[in-house]
Every structure is written in structure tokens, then in C-alpha cells.
Regions:
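Short hydrophobic secondary-structure edge segments in sensory/regulatory modules of signaling proteins
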Residues: 4-5
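PAS/LOV sensory domain surfaces, especially short acidic/polar patches at coil-to-helix junctions
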Residues: 11, 15-23, 35
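Glycine-centered C-terminal helix-capping/turn motifs at helix ends
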Residues: 25-27, 33-34, 42
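Terminal output helix/cap of sensory domains in signal transduction proteins
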Residues: 36-77
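Beta-strand residues that line the small-molecule/cofactor-binding core
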Residues: 66, 78-82, 97
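PAS-family sensory domains
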Residues: 70-72, 83-87, 101
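Sensory coupling linkers of modular signal transduction proteins
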Residues: 88-112
Length: 112
């Protein structure tokens, strides 16, 4: 199974997500695509660390790796996730996108 992936437009609305995202976070495409990332799942994605990432860090760089976010989701419980993201520009239609992959590390233990 692939890691969950979500693609955002520059204004942080969801362009699309992969099947792994929908399964992992128990959401449907019709209630996700076109919505602002912070509004997803009754605002469950309005996470301070995610805001920091999208509003402060990403505008200053083109990508980041292993940005740790912890959050307690209503339907799936507490999750510890590593986010990787990059900004891309599609010249064909002059669209700026943000691609985010999410690795759930909740069950992993620190190696000693």
C-alpha cells in the first residue's frame, strides 16, 4: 500500500488525494476534493503544526522532509505522522500545487 498523498492548490484547497489517504483518514473524495485543507472532516485538519508547515515553512522553501505532526482525529484516534511536501508548478496550465505525503509512524518504536 502506498503512503497517503494529498495534492493542494496554492490556496490550500484539495485538488485530489490517493486511495490510501481516503482509507487511512476515513473520508470520501466527494467530501474532500475542492475543500480547504483546514475544513476537512469537520475541521479536523485545522492542526497548528500543519498551519505552521503550510503557512510559514513551505512558502520559504520548495520542499521539506519528515515534518512531525501529532493529532487526535475523531474517527481514527491519535496519530503521529511524518509529512513530506514539495511545491510544483505546471507550466501547461500555470498552476501551482503542493504535494504532501503522509507516513503514519504511530505504531513505530524508537530504535535503541
Amino acid at each position: 500500500m502506498f503512503d497517503p498523498l494529498i495534492i493542494l492548490y496554492e490556496d490550500l484547497r484539495v485538488a485530489l488525494a490517493n486511495r490510501s489517504f481516503y482509507q487511512a483518514f476515513k473520508v470520501k473524495p466527494e467530501e474532500t476534493e475542492g475543500q480547504h485543507i483546514y475544513d476537512l472532516g469537520n475541521r479536523q485538519w485545522d492542526i497548528p503544526r500543519l498551519r505552521e508547515l503550510l503557512e510559514d515553512i513551505l512558502p520559504e522553501t520548495t520542499s521539506f522532509d519528515n515534518f512531525k505532526v501529532e493529532h487526535d482525529f475523531r474517527d481514527i484516534g491519535k496519530r503521529i505522522m511524518l509529512l513530506n511536501a514539495c511545491r510544483i508548478y505546471l507550466e501547461s496550465n500555470r498552476t501551482k500545487l503542493i504535494i504532501i505525503t503522509i507516513k503514519d509512524i504511530t505504531g513505530e518504536r524508537k530504535k535503541i
